[in-house]
């Protein structure tokens, strides 16, 4: 028989941990961009912004709205829009922009355009020696913000306040507010959410959108063959 005092102790411990989390966690405003149902029955997309100051929060919400409109105009997301919720957490940075240390060998015309900004998630270009690879270095801060503000997230977009082209996949689909931001978001979401490989080969392993099967009738995407030019 389990000692009731042990149960009481663990209940107290859990309550204490929960209270400490509430006291130490930082709560930010969360804007509902698109709501189609309860969070426990929808795919919940959460946007984080990096390099947006408090004075630029309205710009951030406008930028998110443009990306969401473009995202759900694209197939297959347009077909399943009612299955998604979208939220934007308003996390201000101390300075506007991001980092470009100029350390990549493929910076091209941006080679001499070196700059730094004090941002909440410490995003930077030139990651792993690739100029366009834009990543948040402070991922622990991103997880803390998500846990404290939108704990039921499924997909995370991190939008960086710069017009220079860049992005990355991984746990956070990251992209800049470049003119091609919607296309970058759709592309990186394929990596982060669907686990898809790039449309070009460089290395790696077989993924959901890759196959060695030469017979199209046996391909994994056979049910969608020739639908919207899928081949």
Locate each region found by the language model.
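Short pre-active-site segment immediately N-terminal to the catalytic Zn-binding motif
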Residues: 59-60, 166-186
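An acidic- and aromatic-residue-enriched active-site/binding cleft used to recognize and process polar
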Residues: 50, 89-92, 162, 195-199
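Propeptide-to-catalytic entry region of secreted or membrane-anchored zinc metalloproteases
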Residues: 26-146, 180
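Catalytic zinc-binding patch centered on the HExxH motif and its immediate surroundings
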Residues: 97-100, 139-175
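Active-site recognition of the HExxH zinc-binding catalytic motif
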Residues: 182-199
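Short, solvent-exposed loop/turn and secondary-structure capping segments
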Residues: 58-59, 98-101, 168-171, 194-196, ...
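Secretory targeting signatures
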Residues: 1-25
């Amino acid at each position: 028989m389990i000692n009731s005092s042990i149960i009481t102790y663990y209940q107290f411990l859990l309550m204490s941990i929960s209270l400490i989390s509430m006291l130490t966690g930082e709560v930010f405003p969360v804007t509902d961009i698109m709501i189609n149902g309860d969070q426990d029955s929808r795919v919940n997309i959460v946007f984080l912004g990096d390099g947006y100051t408090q004075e630029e929060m309205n710009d951030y919400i406008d930028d998110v709205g443009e990306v969401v409109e473009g995202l759900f105009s694209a197939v297959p997301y347009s077909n399943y829009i009612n299955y998604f919720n979208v939220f934007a957490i308003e996390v201000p940075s101390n300075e506007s922009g991001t980092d470009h240390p100029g350390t990549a060998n493929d910076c091209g015309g941006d080679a001499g355009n070196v700059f730094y900004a004090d941002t909440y998630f410490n995003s930077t270009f030139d990651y792993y020696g690739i100029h366009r690879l834009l990543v948040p270095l402070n991922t622990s801060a991103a997880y803390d913000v998500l846990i404290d503000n939108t704990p039921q997230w499924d997909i995370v977009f991190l939008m960086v306040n710069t017009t220079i082209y860049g992005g990355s996949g991984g746990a956070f689909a990251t992209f800049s507010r470049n003119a091609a931001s919607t296309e970058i978001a759709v592309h990186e979401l394929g990596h982060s959410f669907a686990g898809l490989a790039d449309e070009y080969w460089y290395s790696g392993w077989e993924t959901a959108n890759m196959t060695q099967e030469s017979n199209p009738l046996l391909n994994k995407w056979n049910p969608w063959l020739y639908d919207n030019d899928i081949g």
